[in-house]
């Protein structure tokens, strides 16, 4: 029997590619994918659950890249921000939250304004609007008079023009308490994560009340933006025209109710003057108390909810076993194969290498469905022979799927198919075993049955494919993947990894 300790493994995480039989709007089924066809026919594979309770999210909640990579790396179900926060929401514990209360007491003491900012969306990927509504309730119960809400439009994790219902719910509660909707910005500006600070600063300026784009009410604002073919994600940072509205100024305090950190850090940096980035705003502001819903890595804030700690992810177990490791992705997903795969910690292991292939800086990946996939495969072919465990990410199906352009998403899947054929061919020639999975669904539902674009993630299962034809795999969930790989390598998993291997023996 071959000594598995000499085996090398490449784990490919495809971003945003689920399994669905229906062809309507299904870029995966409609694409020409000769290599995928070959793999599903000739290689062992199984179904993997990547959403809802299987990844520590509420029942039926679609998966996402952060949660997916956390679960893959941890080898256990990771109860993330949404689940943790929802528990307190259901138990009406927001009113007892120490961080919230510290902010509120400071606002009362200084007769300042509390600013609530974040993605107002039912999506549950970066935020959940119900959290905002509960915080508003708490602010009122605690006697705050001056509360301003700064709305970030979604249109990416939910339908492109779906914010109307969120505004209706928000207006009902702000009118009830005489609070204000002070500014509106699309997440394209307020939640950039690619260090394009020209975008972030436009959202920042709107928070301070500096914008030439103004609105009298949200309904008029929506009509104007939509008439210019601007969807929720791309709302021009705009401010309430009323002279009575309080914008962010020195001495005020902020609660940023986004729980996911990656798209919250740049704007937070500008507001509190952190040292995380070099970019500084032209008009800095002094915030008294800044509370983030969860920890934003690299930035010091009050933290409302502490995340579950992952102490022994696959990277650490592999390091202790003496394995050389390679992590590889393009800019858009680099944090996912490093920070999130390692349990929400930025760590470089001994005998490891990280390679980030630069993502193209474009307005829409619909026009560039190739993204940087070729560069990722090229780097893998150059480097993987020197490493025992390689973990990489292909971003195409997710990032192009988010555009809702079916033809482009089909092209993205076809490009991925070709790059996987190159990767597996290289691996087989060098006695490296490949495992291929995905972190969540997306590209398999790019349009609905009426042809309307669908840009959000899905709750469909994904695949786990292996190039080792001697294996048999059973169905499972993302948290089973690390135990499966360690089992294949004859490495004992850590006791924290309480999920089993999917290899049938």
Curated annotation (Swiss-Prot):
InterPro entries: Alkaline_phosphatase_core_sf (IPR017850), BPG-indep_PGM_N (IPR011258), Metalloenzyme (IPR006124), PGAM_B_sf (IPR036646), Pgm_bpd_ind (IPR005995)
Quaternary structure and interacting proteins, as annotated: Monomer.
UniProt catalytic activity: (2R)-2-phosphoglycerate = (2R)-3-phosphoglycerate
Residues at which substrate binds: 126, 156-157, 187, 193, 260-263, 333
Pfam family name, one: Metalloenzyme
Chain's gene name: gpmI
Catalytic residues as annotated in Swiss-Prot or TrEMBL: 65 (phosphoserine intermediate)
Disulfide bonds: none
PANTHER family registered for this protein in UniProt: 2,3-BISPHOSPHOGLYCERATE-INDEPENDENT PHOSPHOGLYCERATE MUTASE
Signal peptide: none
Cofactor or coenzyme needed: Mn(2+)
NCBIfam families reported for this sequence: pgm_bpd_ind
Keywords: Glycolysis, Isomerase, Manganese, Metal-binding
EC number: 5.4.2.12
Keyword Signal: no
Cellular component annotations (GO), alphabetically ordered: cytosol
Pathway entry: Carbohydrate degradation; glycolysis; pyruvate from D-glyceraldehyde 3-phosphate: step 3/5
GO molecular function annotations of the record: manganese ion binding; phosphoglycerate mutase activity
Family: Belongs to the BPG-independent phosphoglycerate mutase family.
Residues annotated as binding Mn(2+) 1: 398, 402, 457
Binding-site list for Mn(2+) 2: 15, 65, 439-440
Cofactor annotation comment: Binds 2 manganese ions per subunit.
Name by which UniProt lists this protein: 2,3-bisphosphoglycerate-independent phosphoglycerate mutase
Physiological role: Catalyzes the interconversion of 2-phosphoglycerate and 3-phosphoglycerate.
């Amino acid at each position: 029997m071959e000594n598995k300790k000499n085996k090398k493994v490449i784990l490919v995480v495809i971003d945003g590619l689920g399994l669905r039989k229906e062809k309507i709007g299904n870029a995966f089924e409609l694409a020409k994918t000769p290599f995928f066809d070959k793999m599903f026919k000739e290689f062992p594979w199984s179904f993997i659950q990547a959403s809802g309770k299987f990844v520590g999210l509420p029942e039926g909640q679609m998966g996402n890249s952060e949660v997916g990579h956390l679960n893959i790396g941890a080898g256990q179900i990771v109860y993330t921000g949404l689940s943790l926060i929802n528990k307190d929401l259901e138990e009406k514990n927001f009113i007892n939250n120490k961080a919230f209360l510290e902010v509120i007491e400071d606002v009362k003491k200084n007769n300042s304004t509390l600013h609530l900012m974040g993605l107002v969306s039912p999506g549950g990927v970066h935020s959940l609007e119900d959290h905002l509504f509960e915080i508003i309730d708490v602010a009122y119960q605690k006697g705050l008079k001056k509360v301003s809400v700064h709305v970030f439009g979604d249109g990416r994790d939910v339908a492109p023009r779906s914010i109307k219902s969120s505004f209706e719910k928000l207006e009902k509660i702000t009118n009830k308490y005489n609070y204000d909707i002070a500014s509106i910005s699309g997440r394209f500006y307020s939640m950039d994560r690619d260090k394009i600070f020209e975008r972030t600063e436009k959202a920042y300026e709107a928070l301070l009340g500096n914008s030439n784009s103004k609105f009298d009410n949200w309904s008029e604002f929506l009509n104007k933006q939509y008439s210019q073919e601007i969807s929720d994600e791309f709302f021009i940072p705009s401010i309430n025209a009323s002279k009575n509205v309080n914008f962010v100024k020195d001495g005020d305090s902020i609660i940023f109710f986004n729980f996911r950190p990656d798209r919250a850090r740049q704007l937070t940096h500008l507001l509190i003057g952190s040292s995380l980035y070099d970019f500084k705003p032209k008009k800095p502001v002094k915030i008294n108390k800044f509370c983030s819903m969860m920890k934003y890595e690299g930035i010091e804030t009050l933290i409302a909810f502490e995340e579950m700690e992952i102490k022994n992810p696959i990277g650490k177990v592999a390091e202790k076993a003496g394995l050389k490791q390679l992590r590889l992705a393009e800019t858009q997903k680099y944090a996912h194969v490093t920070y999130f795969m390692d349990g929400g910690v930025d760590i470089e292991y001994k005998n490891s290498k990280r390679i980030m292939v630069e993502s193209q800086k474009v307005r829409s990946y619909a026009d560039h469905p190739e993204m940087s996939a070729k560069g990722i495969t090229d780097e893998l072919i150059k480097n993987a022979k020197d490493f025992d465990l390689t973990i990489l990410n292909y971003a195409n199906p997710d990032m192009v799927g988010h555009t809702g352009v079916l033809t482009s998403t089909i092209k993205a899947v076809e490009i991925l198919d070709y790059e996987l054929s190159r990767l597996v061919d290289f691996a087989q020639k060098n006695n490296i075993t490949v495992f291929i999975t995905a972190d969540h669904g997306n590209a398999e539902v790019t349009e609905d049955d009426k042809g309307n674009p669908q840009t959000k993630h899905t709750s469909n299962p994904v695949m786990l494919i292996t190039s080792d034809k001697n294996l048999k795999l059973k169905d499972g969930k993302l948290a089973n993947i690390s135990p499966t790989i360690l089992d294949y390598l004859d490495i004992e998993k850590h006791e924290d990894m309480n999920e089993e291997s999917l290899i049938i023996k």
